[in-house]
Structures are given as C-alpha cells and as structure tokens.
Amino acid sequence: MSGHSKFANIKHKKEKNDATKGKIFTRLGREIAVAVKEGGPDPNNNNKLKDIVAKAKANNMPNDTIDRSIKKAAGEGNAVNYEFVTYEGYGPSGTAIIVEALTDNKNRTAANVRNAFTKGNGSVGTQGCVSYMFDQKGQIIIDKEECDMASDDLMMLALDAGASDFNEEDDSFEVLTEPDDFSVVRETLEKAGVPMMQAEVTMIPQTWVELSDETDLKNINRTLDLLDEDDDVQQVYHNWDE
C-alpha cells in the first residue's frame, strides 16, 4: 500500500501530557454530551455516539462512567450545552496548527487559544487558512502485540470493509478510511476481535515541516503545551515533523 502517514506524529496527543485519566474522561464526556444532543442517547441509532463510546473504551473509560455521561447528557435539566469550535493558525516557520474545542463559553476559549499561539510566537488565522493542508480521514491504530491476526488477513479484512489504505510499522498497523466509511470499518474490525489502540476521525497533514532552530522548537512546544492545559481543547493537529 502507499507510504505511511506518520501516524505517530499526526496530532499532538493530549493523553501523553494529561496528569490523570480524569482529564481524558472529562474530554470524552463532552464529546458524548454533544453526540447525544445531536443524535440521541442510543448508540445503536447514533453512529457518532457509537464511535465515541468505542473511543472511550479504548481509553479505558469505565462502562459505568460512559453510561452516566450518556444519561446526564440525555437529561434536559443538568446537561451543559457545549458548542464545537475550530481554530486555525500558524506556529514557528509556517507550521500549520488546527485546534478543535468543545466549549460553553466561546469568548473564553478563543482568548485562551489566541494566548497559546501568541506565547509561542505564532498567530491565529482565519477559517480555512491551514485546513487545506490536511486531509480528514478515519484512522485506526492496532498494536501488533495485541493482534493475533496475520498482517495480510487484517489488511484484506479492512480493505474489504471499505478502508482506503493499510500501513504497517514496526510495532503497529494503521487503517485509513474516508470519514463516511469509518464507522463500518471500525465495527467490522471490532466484530472480528481486532483490538484497537485508537479509532477516530482525524486530520492528516499532506506535507510535514521540520524544525531545527532551538527557538522554534521551544516556541512550538510552548504553544502545544498551553493548548494541552486548556480543558476546552479536545484535539490539536499539526504538521510539525516531531
């Protein structure tokens, strides 16, 4: 298949900088709340919710915590209304950064995101200023040690289900799909007993930017760390070749 998409670098993974599982669960809880509001509380009738529940389980979120999040979101009175917002901007040496957030206060979130860019000598741009540099894809990462299926069999299973690409690294496999095909491919792998480290729709850079200047490296890490610390921020994508 085609060359790999550097999936180890696709996004600045918030999980690695989170001090506790609680922060991860809080972010997943917000995603659940939005999915329930948009499509109802039954995962069998709400593919977006079904995908998020699978993502939550992959992050070891307990079933009772998932159930409570769904029930809370389904209740009219106590549910917080979160709005999905996206910010695009530039880091050092023209690196492209996309920030996805779920917030109940857009003014607060916008100010925090702008501050994170400014502190790293970057800037927030207009909508569309960098998103054209990325492709939206469904992405599934599978740990080789956890997977009993042979590489060729796994590839054929994924491609037959509708995957657009299959890549193999030293310790993992990557399955890529078009966004509309993601749910079907994920469910097919799940039913076949394939363990998934990560399964979500993501943004994959078309090209990568290398940074060697110490000041640039310090600045981009500062921006990404500040975004990590913001509870409103759900995902951060960039094209820095870490």
From Swiss-Prot:
Keywords: Cytoplasm, DNA-binding, Transcription, Transcription regulation. Signal peptide: none annotated. It is found in: Cytoplasm. GO terms for molecular function: DNA binding. InterPro entries: Integrase-like_N, TACO1_YebC-like_2nd/3rd_dom, TACO1_YebC_N, Transcrip_reg_TACO1-like, Transcrip_reg_TACO1-like_dom3, YebC-like. Its main location: cytoplasm. It comes from the Bacteria. One of its GO terms (biological process) is regulation of DNA-templated transcription. GO terms for cellular component: cytosol. NCBIfam families: PRK00110.1 (NF001030), PRK12378.1 (NF009044), YebC/PmpR family DNA-binding transcriptional regulator (TIGR01033). PANTHER family: TRANSCRIPTIONAL REGULATORY PROTEIN YEBC-RELATED (PTHR12532:SF6), TRANSLATIONAL ACTIVATOR OF CYTOCHROME C OXIDASE 1 (PTHR12532). Belongs to the TACO1 family. This is Probable transcriptional regulatory protein Cphy_2507. It comes from Lachnoclostridium phytofermentans (strain ATCC 700394 / DSM 18823 / ISDg).
